[in-house]
Amino acid sequence: MKALVLFSGGIDSTTALGLAIKKYGKDQVIALSISYGQKHDKEIRAAIAVAEYYGVEHLFLDLSKIFQYSNCSLLQQSMEEIPEESYAEQISKTNGDKPVSTYVPFRNGLFLSSAASIALSKECGVIYYGAHADDSAGFAYPDCSPVFNQAMNEAIWEGSGHQLKIEAPFVNVSKAEVVRIGLELGVPYELTWSCYEGGEKPCGKCGTCIDRAAAFQANHVEDPALR
């Protein structure tokens, strides 16, 4: 069976890619990177580097027009600044009543639906994506939750005529556990990019930089991307 991996070039999707390659072999794995109108292309460039490292087929899709009406702080047209604080701090300000400002409206739903069409066309039987438990905690990113994953899996399974399913290996584990798994796999974290800003180096202040640093610290390992 062939696998398609939703692949951003960050820690989570790169670890998911590593797992898929371990299970199916690189010749049976396709990486799909999706542009959604984000403020920089650092993630895409990282994705290209990692895909080349593994030697997998790499596809690209542009969904930026779908998100042109959103004011999510990650997007080019947004007037909002990307928050320089942890997700926990952001959630505390809203009591968890709404997602964080870096939540792109229903992004994972659109990504998975688009990936399903491509996966079926490429004769894949499974879609991997790297949502983890920390993302859905406190309603920060509701399209990363186990409930969302189950609903999308059922929709894609039925809509594909029982030919395609979702594999979300980290949906019930923390980012620290994702990094632990990746370290065991020998994932090239030095090639990945997580920061929401597009600077020469990671800002170290945005929510995803803070989460990334904590995940490596929990594993008592220096982040290789910062060496």
Where are these regions (language model features)?
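ATP-dependent adenylation/nucleotidyltransferase module used to activate substrates
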Residues: 1-186
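Short functional micro-motifs and their immediate structural scaffolds
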Residues: 25, 188, 211-214
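Local cysteine-cluster metal-coordination motifs and their immediate loop/turn environment
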Residues: 109, 113, 193-214
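Glycine-rich nucleotide phosphate-binding loop and flanking beta-alpha elements
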Residues: 135, 216-217
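Short amphipathic alpha-helical interaction/hinge segments
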Residues: 160, 217-220
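A short pocket-lining beta-strand/turn micro-motif at the edge of beta-sheets
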Residues: 162, 189-191, 202
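Short, intrinsically disordered, charge-biased short linear motifs at domain edges
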Residues: 182-184, 189-198
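Short cysteine/histidine-rich metal-coordination sites, predominantly Zn2+-binding motifs
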Residues: 198-199, 220-227
